[in-house]
Amino acid sequence: MFSYISNYLISVEPLGFILYYTSLYIWIPSLLQTIFNNNEKQLSYSSKIEWTNKIVATISSIVSFSLSCYCIYNKKSWVTNEMTSTCALSDFILKFISFYFLFDALHLIIYYKQLFDWPIIIHHLVVGILSYVYIGLYYKKVHLTLLYFLLFEITNPFIHMKWFLKDLKLENHILYSINGFMMAFFFIFIRDIYVPIKVVKIYINGYTELNSIANTIIFFCFPIITILNLFWTYLVIKGILKHLSRTKTSTPQIKKKN
């Protein structure tokens, strides 16, 4: 089953990725306009661009996370060396996320007035080009490690959902609080605990010398990513506590009748 799915997905050429992402950026704005019009709500030009960007990012995150989980779960079928083993499915996943980074970077540049953000551009260049394209697709190494890093993607839908709810003025809705707690949980469990432990185990148990560029990228980026994840987790928890305190103070107090 694993080999069948892998062989099917790998048959998708780069043209398939180009058509896939192009179609998303074409039909999502039209769909958004229709949904907002049917609900008698206005959707500005800037909002439409931002909604489209975040919806595509959410779809990409869900697909990347799901396929990475499946590939990691079946690692006994393809991993003989945790540092060097690759398979058709891992190759497909890295191509999928790399094309997302490319299209998202282009989207940020084309609509720079609404979206441009230097940290995101730098992230796409460092993570997308150096890690996934160079190490994963060109150098053909550490696929398992890169798949573990892609588990970080599970937090992105909750980050974007927070923005969606905020834009819809639903900050006081119960969904906003639930989304915040789920986001904090996955930040702590996946980004701060699970993935770092797994990646460290790979390098302790089966370290294989890579070339100088790959070694520099991995040993320079991993500590930075870990520190950033801890900092972002702090901001997430701080935001939740702030929201809870604001909600508590805004709740009308009912006076007891004597």
Curated annotation (Swiss-Prot):
A Pfam family this chain is assigned to: TRAM_LAG1_CLN8
Xref: InterPro entries: TLC-dom, TLCD
Keywords, ordered alphabetically: Membrane, Transmembrane, Transmembrane helix
GO cellular component term, pick one: endoplasmic reticulum
Membrane disposition: Multi-pass membrane protein
Subcellular location: Membrane
GO biological process terms on file: lipid homeostasis
TM stretches of this protein: 8-28, 49-71, 92-112, 118-138, 144-164, 170-190, 217-237
Ranges of residues in domain TLC: 46-245
Residues in the signal sequence: none
UniProt similarity note: Belongs to the TLCD4 family.
Name of protein: TLC domain-containing protein 4 A
The organism of origin for this protein: Dictyostelium discoideum
